[in-house]
Amino acid sequence: MEKEGADYLIIQSNMMTSAMVAKDLAALKLSTKMICLNWAIDEMWVDLVKEAGEGVYGCIPYALWSDENLPGVRVMHQVSNKYHRNIRTRPCHYVQGFVAAMLLEEALKRVPTKPTGKQIREAFETFRNVDTGGLLPPVTYTATSHEPCNSLRIYQVKKGKLVPVTNYITVSR
């Protein structure tokens, strides 16, 4: 990669693949900077790759399990502890799934008792800056956009921890 002048390697894969790549970059002592997109990095990944993860960047659109200062993360911890005690961390997929369930619950509050699929979709489309307690930036759905999030923060692995290096960066729709 260095021979070809690659300064950055951007990876969107699963965490096992990105972990292998990070370890190989470190073993080969390459200076190419690694950027992992949302499914390729989280706190469990950092524990897996150890020192090989130092300096790696991650683009993450939702809160981390360790963001205990956020109300949504505290609720997520309470729910997790109710059913699975002694879990010290959860992967990004858990956070993303929790947010999806939270948003579905909010949509179901806005429909009749036995809703149709169309009514549920229309309920989602009423969302304007729905607060997830910091799990995501405020969520808006419209008839033309069903994207719950168009923002992310960039993190960097520093001393074995994912540390935010930006605030949320938002792309206009």
Task: List where the protein language model places each region.
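Extracytosolic ligand-binding ectodomains
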Residues: 1-173
